[in-house]
């Protein structure tokens, strides 16, 4: 006797559409997100798989204006350095990219991995401790899909110095910085990645290696 939900063709089609329309969003409206929705997103993230059921993700909600200012300043510094690393012929194209929504996104989450957690009792981590951080990324992706299903957009800001973020948010030393997420109502929706539309990088078919 079936006890779980029925994932019928209609559901699968909707799920496929969710994957296609999940975008890395940089352009947000400033409309607030209600607290019930925020709580639901974090609850969905907690449903993600994790090595040894360790749930090592730690979400820090960044509301304080001064702390957000530190993040913006750090992005500005890191982005200038990253642009300088590009070949000269690509630097102007890089400068035209909008790589963050730090000034617009109403909800901002810094995501860390608790490298000292005893939850899970180390199961599956002895030979591959990096699976803890992989687990955090799974939680981020789960939250991302949950947000998109509710009409929200998510932008992952990676042009940041982890030590600066960790210090600015005053988190335990055992927490390793993984991601800074900007979340809000997108100004536009598109099934094609912005970097592809701007000519920076198109998607490529995924090769499958068989042995």
UniProtKB/Swiss-Prot annotation:
It comes from the Bacteria. Disruption phenotype: Cells lacking this gene fail to synthesize cobalamin. One of its GO terms (molecular function) is 5,6-dimethylbenzimidazole synthase activity. CDD domains: BluB (cd02145). Its EC number is 1.13.11.79. FMN binds at residues 22-26, 50, 99, 158. One of its GO terms (biological process) is cobalamin biosynthetic process. Pfam families: Nitroreductase. It catalyses: FMNH2 + O2 = dialurate + 5,6-dimethylbenzimidazole + D-erythrose 4-phosphate + H(+). Signal peptide: none annotated. Keywords: Cobalamin biosynthesis, Flavoprotein, FMN, NAD, NADP, Nucleotide-binding, Oxidoreductase. InterPro entries: BluB, Nitroreductase, Nitroreductase-like, Nitroreductase/BluB. Involved in the biosynthesis of cobalamin (vitamin B12). Catalyzes the oxidative fragmentation and contraction of the isoalloxazine heterocycle and the cleavage of the ribityl tail of FMNH(2) to form 5,6-dimethylbenzimidazole (DMB) and D-erythrose 4-phosphate (E4P). NAD(P)H is only required initially to reduce FMN and oxygen drives the oxidative fragmentation. Belongs to the BluB family. Homooctamer. This is 5,6-dimethylbenzimidazole synthase. It comes from Rhodospirillum rubrum (strain ATCC 11170 / ATH 1.1.1 / DSM 467 / LMG 4362 / NCIMB 8255 / S1).
